[in-house]
C-alpha cells in the first residue's frame, strides 16, 4: 500500500485525497474480482463490527453484513428500537462503551455533526458513515465504481448528472466525489434546492486542482446534454414529513427521469442510476398513496417505470457494488 488508511474514519469524501479515493476504488475492484473467482482471502478474522442504525436500511445493512462475513468479521446489528441511544444514554457515552467492545462502528442516522463530533470523536476506533442527512460516502464509492465499469473512459473524463433535490446527502456527495476525481459533474434542480453556497464554493476550489467541471442549472435538458450517466433519488427523504410531498412534486416534476429526458441527453448509451429504493411505479405503499392523489405519477415519481426497467438502468449493479466498496473500506482500515 502506497499510503496507510489503517484506523481511519470514513465520514465524508471531503476527508480523503483523490489518490486515497482511487486506491479504495482499485481495492474494491480487486475484491470484487476475488469474490467472483472464488479466490477471496479473509483479512478481518477476529474483528468485531457494530452496526448502529437510527434509520432503517436494506442495502447498507446487507452490504456491511455480507462484507464482514466474507472477510471473517463478526457483526452486531443495533437497530432503531434495540438500544438506549438517545433515550437513556448519549451518543458520546455509547461511543465510549462500544469502542471498548468493537474494532469498528458503522452509523446510519441523521446528524453529520453528531457522527463526527460525538461518535467518531469518542469511540477510539474507526467509525463509518452509512448515511446521514448531509452525506452518503459509502454510496459514492459504489456509484463511481459502477460508472467506471460501464464506461470506456478514464474516470476523469466521465460526465454525470444528478436531477432532483440536490440539498440532500446524494446531491452533496455526488458534487464532492466528482470534484475530488476531476469528473464532469452536473446538478439539475430548482435553485433553492441546490447544495449550499459554501459546499459549492469548496467543491469549485477542489475542482481548480483536479480539473473537475461543475455545472449547476435549473434546466433539466441542459443538465443532461451529452452526459454519460443520469442519477436521481427520491423526492422526499427519510425523516421528512409527508406534508412536503405536494410542494416537492410541484417543484420537481420537470426533473422526473423519463424516456424524453433520457433522449434529451443525445447519448444513445446514457445509463440511469439510482441509490434505491425507487418509486418507479405504484406497487409500493408510498407509490399507491401518491398515485391516488396524483394519477399522472402512477407510472413512477422520480423515475418512470419504462426507464427503470430498461437496459439503460444499472441501479442493481450499483446496489451490488455497495458491498464490494464497503468491503474495501473495511479491509483498508481494519485489515491485517
Curated annotation (Swiss-Prot):
PANTHER family linked to this entry: ORNITHINE CARBAMOYLTRANSFERASE, ORNITHINE CARBAMOYLTRANSFERASE, MITOCHONDRIAL
One function term, GO molecular function aspect: ornithine carbamoyltransferase activity
Binding residues for L-ornithine: 169, 233, 237-238
Organism: Chromobacterium violaceum (strain ATCC 12472 / DSM 30191 / JCM 1249 / CCUG 213 / NBRC 12614 / NCIMB 9131 / NCTC 9757 / MK)
EC primary class: transferase
Protein name (record): Ornithine carbamoyltransferase, catabolic
Keywords: Arginine metabolism, Cytoplasm, Transferase
NCBIfam families to which the protein is assigned, alphabetical: orni_carb_tr, PRK01713.1, PRK04284.1
GO-annotated biological processes: arginine biosynthetic process via ornithine; arginine catabolic process to ornithine; citrulline biosynthetic process; L-arginine biosynthetic process
Function: Reversibly catalyzes the transfer of the carbamoyl group from carbamoyl phosphate (CP) to the N(epsilon) atom of ornithine (ORN) to produce L-citrulline.
SUPFAM superfamilies: Aspartate/ornithine carbamoyltransferase
Annotated binding of carbamoyl phosphate, by residue: 57-60, 84, 108, 136-139, 275-276, 322
UniProt catalytic activity: carbamoyl phosphate + L-ornithine = L-citrulline + phosphate + H(+)
Protein family membership: Belongs to the aspartate/ornithine carbamoyltransferase superfamily. OTCase family.
Pathway: Amino-acid degradation; L-arginine degradation via ADI pathway; carbamoyl phosphate from L-arginine: step 2/2
EC number: 2.1.3.3
Location within or outside the cell: Cytoplasm
GO cellular component: cytoplasm
